[in-house]
Amino acid sequence: MQEQYNPQDLEQKIQKHWDDNKTFVVTEDANKEKFYCLSMFPYPSGRLHMGHVRNYTIGDVVSRYQRLQGKNVMQPIGWDAFGLPAENAAVKNKTAPAPWTYENIEYMKNQLKLLGFGYDWNREFATCTPEYYRWEQEFFTKLYSKGLVYKKTSSVNWCPNDQTVLANEQVEDGCCWRCDTPVEQKKIPQWFIKITEYAQELLDDLDNLDGWPEMVKTMQRNWIGRSEGVELSFAVNGEESPLEVYTTRPDTLMGVTYVGIAAGHPLAEKASQNNPELAAFVEECRNTKVAEAELATMEKKGMDTGLRAIHPLNGREVPVFVANFVLMDYGTGAVMAVPAHDQRDFEFATKYGLDIIPVIKPEDGSDLDVSEAAYTEKGVLFDSGEFDGLAFQEAFDAIAAKLEAEGKGKKTVNFRLRDWGVSRQRYWGAPIPMVTTEDGEVHPVPADQLPVILPEDVVMDGVTSPIKADKEWAKTTFNGEPALRETDTFDTFMESSWYYARYCSPQADDILDPEKANYWLPVDQYIGGIEHACMHLLYSRFFHKLLRDAGYVTSDEPFKQLLCQGMVLADAFYYTNDKGGKEWVAPTDVTIERDAKGRIEKAVDDQGREVEHSGMIKMSKSKNNGIDPQEMVDKYGADTVRLFMMFASPADMTLEWQESGVEGANRFLKRVWKLVHEHTNKGTTEALDTSSLTGDQKALRRDVHKTIAKVSDDIGRRQTFNTAIAAIMELMNKLNKAPQESAQDRALLDEALKAVVAMLYPMTPHASFAMWEALGESDLDSATWPTFDENALVEDEKTIVVMINGKLRAKLVVAADATEEHVRELGLKDENAMKFLDGLTIRKVIYVPGKLLNIVAN
């Protein structure tokens, strides 16, 4: 091996070896335990960022570790290639999304290879190819025939100037990002998949996901939002149909003083027809898209419709208000309002002078006061007629029973989860395989006419989707009759909901090859950001159950174990421009002065401007604080970047990018390289004779095997990769100081270095591969992970700490099997101990076996 560690030459050579030998190409092998490791696949944006590097390094570390455990490891990669950014880039660069996407894939693929990730490139695919989305289209038609797909009108963001639908991220402060026109809500027909039919199973099966972070499971439970309540009807004067509402608090029913309905409710539309003021308010509400998260803090507004609803039990008439906090997308679009016992209802009632009637009082008999705020706790009913004195559950059951007996309500289970709207009015997505014939009937495209191919040679005007603008593209036939294609495309979450399964058989002439899929699935380790907790991870779980029910897979869940890696943070700097806005400056263009504690005192950019330090924040283009992985690999080598990524922070916590830390990782690798070089340069070593080791040699070997045990547990079970690396570093410090005079010294060092190199292999595969060869071994990629020798961990001697009146006063080295009497005797005779006990009377001696002798004296 070369004396100097030169990663650039070394890494290229070893990457070529992996390519030539197809090292990471795998097939099913019934005789080997499989391990499927998957990192969330990237969107081909053009360049890898450090968030990608962290995600894929974690995946590669897990994969290589499992490989050395003797498992049949599959680690695939591909491209989540459809999506809005490609359309925006195409408009900006005056090209089509397809060539931009394919060029980016090629560039990013090379970047991934330079980082040494052990992918099975034979399984690579991009979701924007017909070979991939063709099976998605066919599966969608099968779901349609099963009754799991339907079409209904739903609201979208509409720009009246451009006459186009906008994605949520294209709406800025309520206006179109392109022309600044106020955005409206427009109802159009869209396709939905019935995820709600699987709501209970999706909820229940979370209990089986022992390998998932509790936080993600909690987020999904809340998103699914199961609640038990009562569905009840309020008749409306002058209307045939009653208002249906759902409540989880039927015990408060006698305190209802108004009913709130959403602006999109049919009753609101009807009431506003002859009421211009109400019509204007309804329009305002409908064009103000409110996220559910904002409901608690937004200003509550409403308007009386003039309609009166009739209380289902006491017959009292209450006003019906259109209210901006009632959403049509959730529940029935109508709520019963109890201002005395719901804070939102209280604020609204206070604002509009509506009655506040308390009907629940504290169980402990304390005074009830609803003058300043609602009393929202459960309690005992009063002023509720026959239900007075009942506690929550008794009242719930009794009121539900009475409503049911009178045909005005029933107990029901409700879910917050809504069906999955999969239509997007964009171009760069998979075409939805449905057609409409001239009689207005909708039909799925027959399997023999799939895929419906998205034309790639298009011109983007930045306004209308090319397949909507091209009237000829939509023209087709169905059973010989003229028909029009659906010009909406699938939500890109569709492609990412089943890609993990396609990797098992990427060339299959069906969505999956069941035999191969059931060998590899479920994924043993999935790695990705927690931001995907409620969308991608839920849709993938749903899709897996659809695949199971269609007979393709036998497992219930797609991902056994989930690791959500933390974000990568970096220093961010800005100066204020003439208009008062922030101009962000790249950290690489900033010179920093620090105080004695390392805090930034002054920062100046390359133009001589003093800039403000905004702190350590997430790397992003908008803050101009991203660090190009390519530059770091060119400067330090892939192994150093990988090692820093795994060492700088626990995998599930944020990582603060510090180039000084990268330099530290590089120095450590060089130290390992140097010791291996020095050791191998001295020639071959004799066999290690463990029976004739000296005390010091036994102690060093014990450290080696303790480290193997710790690193194996840290990587394999705990996934605390940073502590595994810290343990290897600690061992290296001892090896650097170890004597190398005798033949057995060198034999012991040989065993230790082989263990160190193998343990570093998942993090630093290139350097480890070369050092392994230098140590006289062959092909580290198919080697076996080091195992610790139980006998080496057995200690001949123990160090006992002697404490006198709570202070450390002496240390005793005793035989590992020394008795308590022997330790007491030695402790009381120890010179240091005797010095501190002089003139004192011993009151108590406490012995903690193998660790501590505690003497209390006065």
UniProtKB/Swiss-Prot annotation:
Protein name, UniProt field: Leucine--tRNA ligase
Motif ('KMSKS' region) on chain: 618-622
Amino acids binding ATP: K621
Organism, scientific name: Aliivibrio fischeri (strain MJ11)
Gene3D superfamilies assigned: 2.20.28.290, 3.10.20.590, HUPs, Isoleucyl-tRNA Synthetase, Domain 1, Valyl/Leucyl/Isoleucyl-tRNA synthetase, editing domain
Annotated compartments: Cytoplasm
EC number: 6.1.1.4
InterPro entries, alphabetized: aa-tRNA-synth_I_CS, aa-tRNA-synth_Ia, Leu-tRNA-ligase, Leu_tRNA-synth_edit, M/V/L/I-tRNA-synth_anticd-bd, Methionyl/Leucyl_tRNA_Synth, Rossmann-like_a/b/a_fold, tRNAsynth_Ia_anticodon-bd
UniProt cross-references to SUPFAM superfamilies, sorted A to Z: Anticodon-binding domain of a subclass of class I aminoacyl-tRNA synthetases (SSF47323), Nucleotidylyl transferase (SSF52374), ValRS/IleRS/LeuRS editing domain (SSF50677)
GO molecular function, one term: aminoacyl-tRNA deacylase activity
Disulfide cysteine pairs (residue numbers): none
Top-level enzyme category: ligase
Keywords: Aminoacyl-tRNA synthetase, ATP-binding, Cytoplasm, Ligase, Nucleotide-binding, Protein biosynthesis
Short motif ('HIGH' region): ranges: 42-52
Family affiliation: Belongs to the class-I aminoacyl-tRNA synthetase family.
One GO location term (cellular component): cytosol
Pfam families: Anticodon_1, tRNA-synt_1, tRNA-synt_1_2, tRNA-synt_1g
Reaction equation(s) it catalyzes: tRNA(Leu) + L-leucine + ATP = L-leucyl-tRNA(Leu) + AMP + diphosphate
GO terms classed as biological process: leucyl-tRNA aminoacylation
